[in-house]
Amino acid sequence: MGDAAVHATRAAALVEGSVVMKLASLKNGSRDGKLVVVSRDLKKAVAVPQIATTMQFALDHWSSVAPALAEVYQGLNHGTVQDEFVFSEQDCESPLPRAYQWADGSAYVNHVELVRRARNSEMPPSFWTDPLMYQGGSDDFIGPRDQIEVVSTEYGIDFEGEVAVI
């Protein structure tokens, strides 16, 4: 996996002014995970419950929490933050384990053709004039290193990776 893909899966990067912060949601047994600030090199993290308990809370209150998150991020990178711990992507949830919604547009005709062929389905004639877009269920996102659970291979399940822009 290239550096860009690793960075995208390990932490969500959010911009506050000219400061790029790396934030992640750690698994903690709750439905939304626990927000942590992650160091630039992705080696250390620190929980910030005094600022925001979840990524969703941080996004919903961005204008009021971003300055404090940026300060923690700078301190973490300069070694001046207490209670830091080793960051491990295996401990991560999806950045937003339960997003309000997500939409997917199938822009790659080759991919659509391959999937249709695998299911012995014809390409719909309308595909060439009407963009294929759908809204997906976002109640069960998984973390970047979680196992993909499949009840039975008899369903002919196909899966793909998606990129989230937060």
Please report, for each region that a protein language model flagged, where it lies by residue.
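Short beta-strand-centered aromatic/proline hotspots
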Residues: 36
